Amino acid sequence: MLLKKFIFLNWATIISMDKKTGFKHTSLWIILIAILIGGLTSCILEPKEPQAEVIPAVPEPLAQTLSYEILNTLPHDPTCYTQGLVIHEGIFYESCGLYGQSSLRKVEPTSGIVQAESDLSANYFAEGLVLLDGKLYQLTWQENTGFVYGASTLEPISTFHYQTQGWGLTTDGSALILSDGSNTLYWLDPGSMQVLRQVNVSYEGQPVEYLNELEYINGTLFANIYLTDTIVAIDPKDGRVISLIDLTGLRPEQNLTMQGEVLNGIAYDDQNDKLYVTGKNWPNLYEIRLVPQNPATPTTPQ
């Protein structure tokens, strides 16, 4: 309405001016007015292109940092270069590595006594271990070969093959989950060993390399980061690290001078809700409880 009123008043002014000059420039003014009206009308009638809706980016939730409390200290054979650890019905099953020293063991927790043992050939370097449907699955490092054992006897049942290196191994109850030292985790069919899917693990958008021993706990994947005192908790759906678990101070003093004798070995007792960790050639195995990180130094072994 305001725009129409503006055009009408200016038209009247122009006609009045032309009357005083004898309508000398009437035709020119009419042309100019027509152009003006046409341009303004075009501005009014031309639909505006809708603006794209701006959706603010949702920041990735920050991973929480956890520390630990030691609830119990158990004996552990310091000759075992721990590569995989499982607890089932009160018994530990452990994969010990190194060429010429690799084995699968059945261990009584309180005493640390090895109840049964199955040795690997000297050309195999044992790695991750998991129990699924009454069978123990054990990886080897660079040999692309795994072994299946009866859990009660540790008698070998069969072998299987995979395309990557073998580092850590766990299960979500149906598939095997394998790490190969990179930031990629592989879900394998336990029958065919075909890759069902794979997930890249990241922390704040950056890849997390050297994923080693694995444990699946109540829908979350836990992984040792090789050569560190850190365990990461991973969302298996997208590979995002949701917690950093700082186990600084847990490594025994006698293992500090040896670069390779690091934290490695996670076992969760789902029947009793107990979490155990150990390391390569460590003299102890620890039951721990995860707690929010405190600025103070984490609890150290007594």
Q: What positions do the PLM features span?
A:
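A short helix->beta-strand "capping" segment at the edge of beta-propeller domains
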Residues: 58-78, 111-113
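Beta-strand-rich domains and repeat architectures in extracellular enzymes and scaffolds
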Residues: 71-103, 119-130
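Surface loop/turn motifs at the tips and blade-to-blade linkers of beta-strand repeat domains
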Residues: 73-78, 118-122, 158-163, 200-206, ...
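Signature of short aromatic-glycine-proline-rich micro-motifs recurring in repeat-based ectodomains
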Residues: 82, 211, 258-265
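Conserved beta-strand positions in repeat-built beta-propeller and related beta-rich domains
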Residues: 93-98, 136-143, 178-182, 223-227, ...
